[in-house]
């Protein structure tokens, strides 16, 4: 199973109807942007497991990451699962990194079933990498916009119900 949970702005875009969950607001009922990002990732994890018809306890490992210091959003999203967690940080490549590493772990027999997840939040990314929103600086029309989104996918040695086709990772020169 796999799932994507997104913020309100992303849900209003051209892919809006393809997401599994669209938040009503970017705070998601939390007191900080970081906690909102964690809640978004937790939602994606739960939806991916539900689509795979698997309980959290069936996982050997969670590989997850985000753009926050010490991957705190992913840690908080994963700690409720009572499953070992390995934080990933690859910035924009975090999800691909988790899927590739997860595939290696499953293929080698080091794990039977695991979950890879990643998230980002526009407001926490602005605070950490650009200009805090409280600063009040005006954005140019061409300024980058970090997505408020999370994705999760279950990987396993046996076919996972409701899963996508297998994929290959290739190195090109």
Question: Which stretches of residues belong to each language-model region?
Answer:
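Condensing-enzyme catalytic core mediating Claisen C-C bond formation in acyl metabolism
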Residues: 1-34, 132-173
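Solvent-exposed alpha-helices and their adjacent loops that cap or buttress functional pockets
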Residues: 54-55, 77-80, 94, 106-109, ...
């Amino acid at each position: 199973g796999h799932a994507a949970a997104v913020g309100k702005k992303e849900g209003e875009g051209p892919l809006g109807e393809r997401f599994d969950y669209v938040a009503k607001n970017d705070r998601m009922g939390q007191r900080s942007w970081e906690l909102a990002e964690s809640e978004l990732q937790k939602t994606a994890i739960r939806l991916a497991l539900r689509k795979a018809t698997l309980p959290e306890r069936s996982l050997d490992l969670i590989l997850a990451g985000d753009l926050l210091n010490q991957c705190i959003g992913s840690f908080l999203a994963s700690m409720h699962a009572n499953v070992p967690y390995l934080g990933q940080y690859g910035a924009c490549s975090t999800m691909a990194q988790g899927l590739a590493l997860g595939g290696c772990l499953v293929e080698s027999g080091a794990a039977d079933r695991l979950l890879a997840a990643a998230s980002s939040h526009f407001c926490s990314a602005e605070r950490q990498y650009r200009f805090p929103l409280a600063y009040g600086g005006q954005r140019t029309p061409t300024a980058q916009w970090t997505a408020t989104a999370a994705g999760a996918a279950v990987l396993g040695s046996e076919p996972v119900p409701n899963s996508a086709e297998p994929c290959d990772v290739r190195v090109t020169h």
